[in-house]
Amino acid sequence: GSLATASEKTRESLLRQLGDLKIMMPRNYNELGRFYGVSATAGIVEETLWRGYMFWYLGHVMPLWAAAIVTSVIFGFGHIYQGIANVAKIILVGGVFAGLYLLTGSLWLPMLLHAVFDAVQGKAVYGLLSSASSNPSSSASSRIRGS
């Protein structure tokens, strides 16, 4: 009925928004497990680089609030491959991580939240891609397979 049609339209809209990023996203259970590993690595490495090193370095030459803004903007544009529309969102997320680092004095919470944030997004996209590819009549399914 109309609910299934609305659901299919929503799914197709989300798949269009993913664009070229689909190739990087998990499509099956094995890839999902690997994606979780990548998420953990991104949380640790990116937070160490952006909040641990760059923020620390800039904090010596500018006020901490300015260092938080600068590192968040650079962090956001470092994710430009996700599309310009997502850069602003990622800048805000970087600002939250910088704020958590300032509040706690530790990278552990930003690392953990970064990893969880990435993993949750990967799981959501996995659900989207696996449901689209399991529905062979879906036009979204044919686009995922490259048909």
List PLM regions with ranges:
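Membrane-water interface of transmembrane alpha-helices
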Residues: 1-13
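Transmembrane helix-loop-helix hairpins at the membrane interface
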Residues: 19-147
